[in-house]
C-alpha cells in the first residue's frame, strides 16, 4: 500500500528544484558565464576548482566561494548564488559518508545498496525519495534492498502529542516505571511498525510488563532462588541427561523454544517485526503457566546425587531461559 500509494504517487510528480536561496548549505558547484547564462561550468572536485581558479581552496561555504571567480579565455564565471536543498544532501548520504568517488570505492560498493533503512512514514516524500532518485540517476540502481517504515505515534486521544496539551506520559517516568524492554515490545507489537498510526497507551506498556516481563523475571527468580538454595552449580548441570532421555515435559518446552527461535528468525529476516511478539507471549505462557508450575515438585525435592531428575529440571529451565534471552535480544535487550 505504501509502495503503490504514497511512493507511487511521489514518483509521478513534477520535477523538484534542488536549489535553495539560503546562506547556509552546500554550495551548488556551478559557475555561470556573466555574459552568457547558458554557458556554465559544473565543477566535479576541489582539485578541479583549484586548477580552474588558480587558488587554494580552504573553505567550501558561501562566504568564500561566492567571491571566487573563474577566468577562461577572457570569460568570467561566477558561482550561482543558491545552495543545495538539504533533501538532496540526505539522498547523497551513501556517497558522502564514504567520500565516494574520490576514495573508498571498494568499501562503498561493499555496502551499496544498503541492506535496509528505517524511518518514519513522512520520509516517503523525503529521504526515501531522494535516495532512490540519486541512486537511479547515478547507477540505475536502488539505494536500499529493504525498508522499515513506521507510522506516526499519536496521543491516546488520537491527537498529535503536544507539550502544551500534556496529552502523553513523560518518557522518563515511563522508562523508570516499566523499563525499556516493555516499551520496546509494546511499540514493536503495535500498528506503528506496519507504517500505521498508533494511539499511544500507557496501559499497553503495562500489559506487556504484566504478560511478558514479570513472568519471565519470575521464572528466572524461581530458577536462581532454588538453584542457590540447593547449591546447584554449572558442574552439576553438566551431569544432566541428553535431551532425548529427559521427561516429556522437558522435551516439550525445549521443542517449543526451538520453534520460537525458528519463527523469530523467519520473521526478523523478512522484516515482519510486528509478528514477533505474539509467538513470544505464547511461549512465555507455556514456560511460566505450564512448564514451571507443572514441574515445581522436581525443583523442590531434596538434592540427591543419585537423582538425575532434579538436575534435568534445572538444566532444562536454564537452557530455555538462556536461549530465550539470546533469541529475543533484539527486542528485549535489557532483560
Model feature map: region roles:
Residues 1-8, 13:
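Single conserved hydrophobic/aromatic residue that forms the stacking wall/gate
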Residues 22-24, 32, 43-197:
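Alpha-helical recognition segments enriched in aromatics with Gly/Pro capping
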Residues 4, 86, 316:
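Ser/Thr-centric signal marking residues that sit
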Residues 36-40:
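Active-site His/acidic residue clusters
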Residues 10, 14-35, 129, 140-144, ...:
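Helix-rich, typically C-terminal accessory recognition domains appended to large enzymatic cores
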Residues 6-7, 67, 124, 153, ...:
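Generic structural microfeature
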